[in-house]
């Protein structure tokens, strides 16, 4: 019958999706998610334990040490450094205002991050570190954004502010071939009925309207130090935002479909874009917030709610869709 045929088609599509997820990083038994640095304690959204990650997705979270990253960084060769600088100029639109010393500092850290990912077989990572002002680790953590953006673009998403669950959301979007860029809500334009999202952390090349810019920031937003950051807008068209949430009954997914639209944004070294949702900006923000997510989310291109529902069913995780 037609109904039976539809059920069979959905099962086949679901099996393909699960197979795609299991064949890559998050559900691959040979790979882990990484967590290095420390929690951003002033943000309660970051209190999401490794146990929750394991129970929700079967993800092993490797606790990484800054001293290991420092050791890898000190062993970077001149050849590796030159190759990474060439990669920067190939993948990024490097602003002329970027100081050569900052490019070298970021490139050295990027090589060390690559090595960390390879050694620990990481499929995703979350990070944050402050420490005492002027320490060696601050020099490292203020130079990670370029390297983390490269990793994100290569399918190993990196979430800032140590939010493990957002790294998981980014990974899901990456596996769905939707990108998955680190972002957060920061403004609303009621006249244009849009919501603005952005972040100074890792971006994803696949969703950028133009080549991702590498720009200098004389002071990081709400964090110590200075260094390089990225600047981009999401290409106009259909988008999906996804958040992995933790409620009183455990892990659940929160998703919404909308549209990235053109318009004015702040040029401050962020992934700034404007988004319009069918229910309108006011109702969207009201319903999204009442679901109880953190203010971070993963942005991907295309409408992916149908696939996310199948994934949630196969993993036995609830999903809430804001429509």
Region roles according to the model:
Residues 223-323:
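Extended hydrophobic packing segments that form well-structured cores
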Residues 19-139:
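A charged, amphipathic alpha-helical module
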Residues 64, 121, 128, 179-187, ...:
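Flexible, glycine/charged-enriched surface loops at secondary-structure junctions
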Residues 1, 12, 37-46, 128-135, ...:
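Gly/Ser/Thr-rich loops at beta-strand to alpha-helix junctions
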Residues 152-267:
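C-terminal catalytic subdomain
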Residues 3-8:
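Short, small-residue-biased leader/transition segments that mark boundaries at the very start
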Residues 2, 54-64, 178-179, 317-321:
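Structural alpha-beta junctions
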Residues 138-157:
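A short, gly/pro- and small-residue-rich
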């Amino acid at each position: 019958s037609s109904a039976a045929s539809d059920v069979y088609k959905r099962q086949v599509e679901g099996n393909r999706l699960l197979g795609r997820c299991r064949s890559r990083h998050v559900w691959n038994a040979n790979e882990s998610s990484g967590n290095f640095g420390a929690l951003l304690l002033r943000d309660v959204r970051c209190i999401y334990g490794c146990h929750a990650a394991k129970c929700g997705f079967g993800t092993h979270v490797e606790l990484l040490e800054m001293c290991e990253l420092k050791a890898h960084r000190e062993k970077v060769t001149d050849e590796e450094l030159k190759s990474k600088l060439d990669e920067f100029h190939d993948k990024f639109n490097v602003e002329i205002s970027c100081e050569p010393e900052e490019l070298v500092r970021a490139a050295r850290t990027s090589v060390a991050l690559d090595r960390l990912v390879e050694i620990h077989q990481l499929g995703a990572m979350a990070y944050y570190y402050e420490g005492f002002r002027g320490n060696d680790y601050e020099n490292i953590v203020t130079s990670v954004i370029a390297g983390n953006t490269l990793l994100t673009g290569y399918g190993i998403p990196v979430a800032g502010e140590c939010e493990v669950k957002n790294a998981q959301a980014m990974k899901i979007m990456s596996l769905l071939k939707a990108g998955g860029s680190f972002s957060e809500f920061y403004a609303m334009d009621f006249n244009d009925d849009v919501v603005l999202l952005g972040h100074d952390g890792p971006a994803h090349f696949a969703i950028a309207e133009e080549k991702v810019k590498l720009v200098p920031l004389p002071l990081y937003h709400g964090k110590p130090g200075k260094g390089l950051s990225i600047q981009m807008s999401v290409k106009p068209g259909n988008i999906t935002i996804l958040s992995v949430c933790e409620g009183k009954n455990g892990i659940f997914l929160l998703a919404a479909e909308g549209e990235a639209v053109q318009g004015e944004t702040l040029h401050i070294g962020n992934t700034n874009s404007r988004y319009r949702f069918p229910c309108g900006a006011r109702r969207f923000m009201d319903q999204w917030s009442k679901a109880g997510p953190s203010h971070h989310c993963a942005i991907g291109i295309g409408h992916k709610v149908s696939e996310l529902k199948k994934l949630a069913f196969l993993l036995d995780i609830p999903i809430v869709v804001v429509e």
